Amino acid sequence: MPNAIHALVTESRNPFSTHIDQLSTLDMLAVINQEDQKVPFAIENVLPEIAQAVDAIAETFMKNGRLIYLGAGTSGRLGILDASECPPTFGTPHEQVVGLIAGGQQAILKAVENAEDDRSAGEQDLRNLALNEKDVVVGIAASGRTPYVLAGIEYANHVGCVTVGISCNPDSALAALANIAITPIVGPEVITGSSRMKAGTAQKLILNMLTTGAMIKTGKVFGNLMVDVVATNEKLVERQKNIVMEVTQCDRQQAEQALLQSNGQCKVAIVMLLLNMSAEEAKNCLAQANGFIHQALTLVK
């Protein structure tokens, strides 16, 4: 590895928290809060690289490829969290965004010893998904040196995937391997080496951007409304109705009727009402427009 562990920024001591164990609760939290405020600025510095990754992911989605997150510990759990939120939020198939964690399913709730050091598992987990060149693989490792992640990225490169590396240390092995390196430098953690803190926060914000940006670019959002939301609970049933009413300026009864006729598909209900057509006609119109409402409306006009 190009960086010895002790030399990593994420492993260094934070001079602003050296006496945190002697502070009052309020002062302790003030230190943590002050350090957390550095995270968005670190991300601002890497927005061009995040944009590159978003464009690559959007392109792969349009070709029916997948986004696959690969991480260990906190990094792996964050990938799984982001992946699990995509189907209800954007109506995507569960296999479109996948999160892999070193140590497998059991590692989600409980740390698995030495799992992150298992290079062979990084490659094997991707093989088990039948990885192909249409997929984008995002390796997440605060240190930038996690063997499980590095091996996975090496294999993904071999397959011909676009690879992205998210780390919080400069000049990391992960950044060197990935096609697109996203490296927000958030500085030393409040508790030395606890990368679940600022580094984890930075990773979460970046993953939010990757999936949200790609979903916007593939027609899953109209204005700033999640028009492919799946109504899996009462709150989301109401959200669907509110979205349809907001876009079409119809009343609640019309929204409910359109959603019923469209089998709970917001997009279809919206196009039905705006263009005064049947559910089947609206579906066909959206299919011709690759799922983009703006384009569907233009097609008919």
UniProtKB/Swiss-Prot annotation:
The active site is at E85 (proton donor), E116. Residues 57-220 form the SIS domain. It holds the Pfam family GKRP-like_C. Homodimer. Specifically catalyzes the cleavage of the D-lactyl ether substituent of MurNAc 6-phosphate, producing GlcNAc 6-phosphate and D-lactate. Together with AnmK, is also required for the utilization of anhydro-N-acetylmuramic acid (anhMurNAc) either imported from the medium or derived from its own cell wall murein, and thus plays a role in cell wall recycling. A lyase-type mechanism (elimination/hydration) is suggested for the cleavage of the lactyl ether bond of MurNAc 6-phosphate, with the formation of an alpha,beta-unsaturated aldehyde intermediate with (E)-stereochemistry, followed by the syn addition of water to give product. PANTHER family: GLUCOKINASE REGULATORY PROTEIN. This is N-acetylmuramic acid 6-phosphate etherase. It comes from Pasteurella multocida (strain Pm70). The gene is murQ.
